[in-house]
Amino acid sequence: MSQDYKTTLNLPATEFPMRGDLPKREPGILARWEEQGLYQQLRDNAAGRPLFVLHDGPPYANGRIHLGHAVNKILKDIIVKSRYLAGFDAPYVPGWDCHGLPIEIAVEKKWGKVGTKLDAVEFRQKCREFAEEQINIQRVDFKRLGVTGDWDNPYKTLSFDFEANEIRALAKVVANGHLVRGAKPVYWCFDCGSALAEAEIEYQEKESPAIDVAYAARDAQAIGQAFGVSVPADVEVAVPIWTTTPWTLPASLAVSLGAEINYVLAEGPAHNGKRRWLVLAAALAERALQRYGVEAVVLHGEADGSALENQLLAHPFYPEREILVLNGEHVSDEDGTGAVHTAPGHGQEDYVVSQKYGLLDKYNAGQVTPIDGRGVYLESTPPAGDVVLAGQHLWKAQEAIVGVLRDNGALLAFHPIRHSYPHCWRHKTPVVFRATPQWFISMDKANLRNDALAAIDTVGWFPSWGKARIQSMVDGRPDWTISRQRTWGVPIALFTHRQTGEIHPRSVELMQQVADRVEAEGIDVWYSLDAAELLGAEAADYEKVTDILDVWFDSGVTHEGVLAARGFGKPADLYLEGSDQHRGWFQSSLLTGVAIDKRAPYKQCLTHGFTVDEHGRKMSKSLGNGIEPQDIMNKLGADILRLWIASADYSNEMSLSQEILKRNADAYRRLRNTARFLLGNLDGFDPAQHLQPLDQMVALDRWIVHRAWELQEKIKAAYDGYNMAEIVQLLLNFCSVDLGSLYLDVTKDRLYTMPTDSSGRRSAQSAMYHIAEAFTRWVAPILTFTADELWGYLPGERAEHVLFTTWYDGLAPLPADAQLNAADFDQLLAVREQVAKVLEPMRANGAIGAALEAEITIAASEEQAARWQPLADELRFLFISGDVQVRPATTDEVFVSAQPTTKAKCVRCWHHRADVGSNADHPELCGRCVSNITGAGEVRSWF
């Protein structure tokens, strides 16, 4: 009867659970971290190390977090935790953007607009309370993601100290000469009732009426002379313009031509029974005439736009208004007519060219900008023909304006077009350019544009294309409108002279005094402040500015309000946000940083893409393809979400679906099972007693430590380069190939069958201990919960948390002069693959069942055979086969052959050996197993 030898085997044993059960296990780990004060422990443990500061771009304090928030915060957390392991002190202070319109709107829905149920002070208090509520909601979700940071002491742009530091930052901008005031055209949202910054604009498709409008010449002969022709008495001359904003025509004060563009005087359609010649860009004449129903192109003359400068035209429905022909650099001959109607109150280029020609001094404010903040024409706006414009909304009036042009013959063509048009990012409604008195940070007055472009060159950009993107944006951007006509925000704490509008000569000093008061009492102190307290007798001559600062200025000066204020220094090592922030936070921070310090506030900028479904579609409720991070955490666990984020190519759009999540859950199981197998085989291993020196290890064990060292170097470099996807691939490949398909499979025999305390078994355990120590650190930034759990099961004395350590230093490369070096193993593993290929058909045809039933013969060159001959008795363990013979051959190639064994099978180790049954007490065992359970045990050197 067979004996049961199971009790003589060292089978794996561990309490580390096979199932992650993350949704249930992670909250308990979080609670322990909270109780321990993990973040402060991390900082204390890292005290004295060099700083690495990843500065958090503040999310807006409104609503539950979405998948984009999770991507952003988890990427940051992975980087911060990798920096701790790399030997840095890596403080992470999360922040929130707390002022601005969305919060005002939320408060208005409940309490009404300012002055309805609440005065301004009460309204601001409700805004503050609402923002704090939203912060508390979001903070719970962010912490649940496993993000470790100073959650008990975050920065909030609504805190009194931050609001004060923001005013101090503005004072520095003023001191350095960057602040200007003017009635320039700015993006204006009628729903917001306020100016918008460029970062608050998004482009959407919109249908607009495209019209060609004839501006008749006041003096047809004068235009003819510019073309070198005489105009017959029965011929009218006109300059057609093309526009998609008919509502701006009441504000049309000039027509701009390109000075170097070639124009022609072409025969157009008749008007009022008279012939009409039209001034058109030569490159556009044929297309324009086709729009006007003119098939034959008849030209009467040519001239450059410069020859037409200062000619006078008639407004198409205000006959008393003289329209001057200007030369503008913004005019092109790529589309339209080559002539641009110029409304300085409703276009940036229009404003610049009109200012150059002195038009702004000639017309009053109502003529320059005839619409109010709601989009309604002012009472002073003259009628267009018989159509009353005063009191009408511009979108509604457009159709009537087109009708007037059609009736008076000025309309040459009309057709609706779909085009990309600026919209408010909050309301998703079209915006307009509208000239209003605003405060600007000038891009050129004190050389900010050039200084910012120079600063961009000093920054590392990830991905590298980010540099060109932000360069083009800064190079072409207008002045930054930093004022808003709203209630909930940091005041522009300036006093302006009632007569001249100039800011007080002691503004910088006064702003510092206001900031000190705000730090103690909050922003309401500005509105209750009696100017005489600061200005004394001058108070009667000055008034307080009531505008507030753009929220992009709030977040843009966090390098002052957080980095400098908390002693982290500037610049930060890294800013990391979504790719839309080249025009948002990266840019506002760059401009304020350069305006204040003449340098960028960051050393590196990293951007990530947006989340899309598996078909590349943006996630939305209407499509029903959205996946909420809370659902992922509740069903699969935060570590699965973190693994997906790490494995995705964040430099592009990041695809997510239930199938992708399933694949990541499978990958997680592979990593967890590898860790569990390592722990199972470390049962009973005490590194203080059993750890073998590297130079005394079995050769295969020493090699796997070498492979782990190579891998760790790659992983460290990938973390340093923020290449998380590469790390995940390296880890999965190591677990599947180096460990799963090779090392763990090969060493099972040694671990299970050799005596518990034998050097061969302790050698394998030592290698697995080194790998487990390193592996836990490798995954810790990504699988933050699992690494913490794993850390608690590793044998030996250790720090309380894996992040209190640094990259594992127990690994080392295999010396080149080792008896079996890395190159030798490469050759042997190539032979192992040959063996597998030879055995595959033998399995298929039933000649053998398992590889252990095959005996292998290797034929190699005499030199190679001589090197492998000493290994021959142990090669069967590497190949997991029957006996192996090595024979010299007259060839440089290696040949492998195999045949089924006829030897008996040992019931304990399953190897087929000639000496099975040689011991009468154990007739079913091979001699090796008999020695391992009754004698000194076998000795292994190689495998």
Swiss-Prot record:
CDD domains: Anticodon_Ia_Ile_BEm. This is Isoleucine--tRNA ligase. A motif ('KMSKS' region) lies at residues 618-622. Zn(2+) binds at C906, C909, C926, C929. Its main location: cytoplasm. Its cofactor is Zn(2+). L-isoleucyl-5'-AMP binds at E577.
